[in-house]
UniProtKB/Swiss-Prot annotation:
Disulfide bond positions: none
InterPro entries for this protein: DUF4504 (IPR027850)
Family to which this protein belongs: Belongs to the UPF0739 family.
Record-linked Pfam families: DUF4504 (PF14953)
Protein's name according to its UniProt entry: UPF0739 protein C1orf74 homolog
Organism: Rattus norvegicus
Amino acid sequence: MSTPSPQLLVAAAQRTLGMGKRKCPPRATCLHLAGEVLAVARGLKPAVLYDCNSAGVLALQSYLEELQGLGFLKPGLHILEIGENNLIVSPEYTCQHLEQTLLGTVAFVDVSCSQPHPSVLSLDQLPGLKSLIADIITRFQELLKGVSPGVSYSKLHSSDWNLCTLFGILLGYPVSYTFDLNHGEGNCLTMTPLRVFTAQISWLSGQPPVPLYSFSVPESLFPPLRNFLSAWEKELRTRFRAQNAFADLSISSEVVTLPAVAL
């Protein structure tokens, strides 16, 4: 796959994602998005959540098809709609990631507001989530049986799911927050020291790095979560070495304490 000029990538995004009453994404946002989409296509992350503006499924399909027409992407990416959110997904890499999740490679941190401190859970303690992951794997396996030249689309109905937990899994985080929906969407992370992990890569010369991951874990739980985080970093570095579109993978962390944490 070739890398078109930045001007062509920006034009493709503004032409498809800024139609009608939607404001055109600025140049930096367009390049940021193209880099994240390419990272999904190259297997560095299973999905990216589209949050640049209110563009819907049809606009995103047009955008991805334009990138294919520029020789920037191969066919195979998928748009997954969950609630009012759209994710651009690699069915192949998402299947691999979810299959590993069922084997216990992802940890869960219960931050329900009904408890005084965050606590670690395993997937076996979340049977409903385990069943949902298996269903999503089946859905993507069906997609992989025949890749069409266009950009496919599907919708997951999410009336009783914890979207925070589900998005954490789909976006490839090694640790995902969860909480009891029966107690509202509050959490017990207020003024709790959090270790924030950030992974980014270099792409276009003269442009800021492309963010791959940004997630946090309670600092008090860092020791029991260390193995999950180390395995995630090892896997990411392995995938990074297998591609040649990006350079300079950087993974860092810092501890922050916030008066409120929105999930």
